[in-house]
């Protein structure tokens, strides 16, 4: 559900690939429904933001100053739409490269008449580095990222020490990094990374995972998993001064 991009870097790609940042995603083609195509055609000019070369003034983009959340890898956008609709006094930024997902979200924005949501359809790390000012986000959400199960692919996981450091620089003091996964080994891995990341406090009473926060909508995929006895692990970390 998190990100996507070009062909993954491999040694066979030549020497140039060795100097590229390893991506946590692979671009996959997908069929577009009529609604998704409509969303892209009508919603892109209104709600999709271009990569910038300097931090963006989102107060100007949204026409107000409000609490601001960013979700990396919103998939088909159901959760992000629900959160934005439920909190009209807050602003939301979604990042996703899967075109059908972007189209689905934009179609929902148009259908529901939402004005508090904007989208980037490119690499989330590029968005954080180039568009998001330091100390500006109230919350960053990473729900059900690709766990890259095989050990040789662990380097592709988005949650790394460098990611934790980058996110911390973008969060306000007291801002929250909220992650969720349905694969327990990945939850344990994320805890290992975050528990040694400087400048964070784990909000779980036991120092592990928090109960599912009410503000995170339950997806159809998650409900199906619950019926099958599958678990979901939520992690919340607060940025310290």
UniProtKB/Swiss-Prot annotation:
Catalysis performed (reactions): guanosine(46) in tRNA + S-adenosyl-L-methionine = N(7)-methylguanosine(46) in tRNA + S-adenosyl-L-homocysteine
The record's section on Pfam families has: Methyltransf_4
Where is this chain compositionally biased, Polar residues type?
1-10
Which enzyme class? transferase
Task: Give me the ranges of the annotated region Disordered.
Answer: 1-21
* This enzyme's EC code(s): 2.1.1.33
Task: Tell me which residues bind S-adenosyl-L-methionine.
Answer: 71, 96, 123, 146
Q: Has UniProt tagged this entry with the keyword ATP-binding?
A: no
Tell me which residues this entry annotates as catalytic: 146
Give the metabolic or biological pathway.
tRNA modification; N(7)-methylguanine-tRNA biosynthesis
Q: Which GO terms describe its molecular function?
A: tRNA (guanine(46)-N7)-methyltransferase activity
**Residue positions binding substrate:** 150, 182, 219-222
The record's listing under CDD domains reads: AdoMet_MTases (cd02440)
What does the UniProt keyword field contain?
Methyltransferase, S-adenosyl-L-methionine, Transferase, tRNA processing
Q: Which Gene3D superfamilies match?
A: Vaccinia Virus protein VP39
Q: Return the GO cellular component terms, semicolon-separated.
A: tRNA methyltransferase complex
Q: Does the keyword tRNA processing apply?
A: yes
Q: Which family does the similarity line name? A: Belongs to the class I-like SAM-binding methyltransferase superfamily. TrmB family.
Quote the function comment for this protein.
Catalyzes the formation of N(7)-methylguanine at position 46 (m7G46) in tRNA.
In Swiss-Prot or TrEMBL terms, this protein is called tRNA (guanine-N(7)-)-methyltransferase
Q: What is the lineage of its organism?
A: Bacteria, Pseudomonadati, Pseudomonadota, Gammaproteobacteria, Pseudomonadales
Name of the gene this protein is made from? trmB
